[in-house]
Amino acid sequence: MLKRRRCILFPILGSLVLFMGAVDPTVNSLRAKEARAATELALARPGEILFVRAERRRRLAGLPAATREKLCRAPVRKWRSTKAVTTIRATPGYGGDNRTERFALTVMQAGAAAFGAGDRKARRAVVRLIARWAKGRAMTKLEDPEDASSYYVVERTLLPTIVTYWLTVRGDTRIKASTRARIERWLEGLVRRSRETRIDLTSDEVSARNNHAYLAAGVVMAWGALTGDLGMVETAVAVYRRAIAEMRPDGSFPLETMRGARALWYQRHAVASLTVIAEMAAVQGIDLYGYRVGKRDLHRAVAFLLDGIEDPKRVWRYAKANVNPGPIRDYRRQDLGFLRRRAHGRHYMAWAEIYMARFPERAESRRLAALLAESQPDFRPMVDEYSGGNTSCFFYTPPGAAGNRAESGQRE
């Protein structure tokens, strides 16, 4: 697996047990079981990713026009193109190369506008933009092939690009076959690189077991669902199940909650990627929302996050490890900036739209809705790379309306 940038390496391998406790023997015993279970998977709807397009179009058509426009049409007067970023730079310190962010935002906004609002200009713009990046072999080179954060930048850009490609390009015969083929080769190459370099279920390295692995698995899951590649889906499912197995019984993720002032920030990060994987699996008839190891499941992770936001002291005993905490050194000052839309247009709670649509009757969903409204009354639309794009356009369901509720995995 990849090494983290030297300047932010954790002093972790020798003292990980201080933060996590001994490795849960459940994890090792699950590996053989998961290998057997993988052979039982099948894809119910290959070609679909986050939702069934025809069903979502019908639901959007049933919304008032003003609501649909607000959710899906972006406040953009003129869509601008951006030059392909062929080489991802290894940036010093905390974070990563941000030169792909403008591309990603355009892809997310224009993709939703094209799909949900029928915006032809947005569709033309995003098709041209994705084609330009494919032709420019964007993100295919890494300045430092050992830098985990560089792969992370690629994957957070890649997920919404795959989703928008699915919604606007793939299968559209109005687009030249050669253009579609070039885009598909470009995307597939990036996905396969992530699978080969970022996912190792036998590794104990941090980036193989934390939010990095979950994001990579989301990318692999999306491509596997789209192309009908069962092997890729099996890989993503295995990463999800390992994450649940390594969760603490209280719902916290050890490698996220040890992150000092950003303990809840990274708990939310993990929940976001796992929710996306579970939703893509549900579309394919695979129940990951209901997957449990003892009392551990995704719902418990969501509940821990909500409890920690309500009373940050609940995470202090883990956060005090203060491992790679970011700009704030005091672990007692939990960074809750993810509760509001960021200055660059993203809302890091966009995953909640997926969860609330899937489980409208759960207490966690009601708490999420109240929390988001309290933090920022006009919080929709929510757009974020880690959730695949504009989840409000893709998932919002009015209160009381029939949504995507799944009975599996619900706990009263």
Place the predicted regions along the sequence by residue.
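Active-site cradle of extracellular carbohydrate-active enzymes
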Residues: Y152-R268
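Alpha-solenoid repeat scaffolds
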Residues: T140, L230, E246-D250, L288, ...
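Bacterial N-terminal signal peptides
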Residues: P11-F19
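Amphipathic, soluble alpha-helical interaction motifs
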Residues: I277-M280
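Short, well-ordered coil↔helix boundary/capping segments
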Residues: A261-V271, R292-H299
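Extracellular glycan-targeting catalytic surfaces
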Residues: D24-T202, Y214, A282, G290-E412
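Bacterial N-terminal signal peptides that target proteins for export
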Residues: L2-I12
